């Protein structure tokens, strides 16, 4: 069984705020950063923790803790997979050319890059596959900037690990803008 940590308690000068998060420390340690991420003159706390790990999956979670008011209580905002997907789809789209085993990455109506997945064509069965960009996600903090790295993969109906493109244009890096509990990819 994996060791599981449960709950986060933020203690601000004796005022405690509890957040019901759980995570496994089996693979990576959680990381905590303090900076003024939204440039409002007040420092926030960023908590990066393991969200999911397995064959073809490595997801980190990003949570920002913000001092709510003079009471000393904190509130937590998580950059959820749903929000990440909405933000990604505002910037990028995909076109698939099965005949040439290509995945075209579209930005602003133009092909930004072409990912060749011919090497994984033996996994392609009955026309079933899925383009995935939510299973390989990591974060890093540099000064007051939050950076997110993600990879695009092709998942097929065999249910095994997907074909990734880490060295062939399948990696994406974004600045994650945070303001008033909202996250945006830039």
What residue spans do the PLM features occupy?
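Surface-exposed loop/turn elements that mediate protein-protein interactions on large endomembrane-trafficking
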Residues: 5-22, 64-79, 115, 179-182
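Extracellular-facing segments of soluble proteins and assemblies that are Gly/Ser/Thr-biased and enriched
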Residues: 42-99
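Structural motif
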Residues: 53-65, 158-172
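Short aromatic loop motif centered on NTY/YTY
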Residues: 75-167
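Long, compositionally biased interface segments
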Residues: 164-186
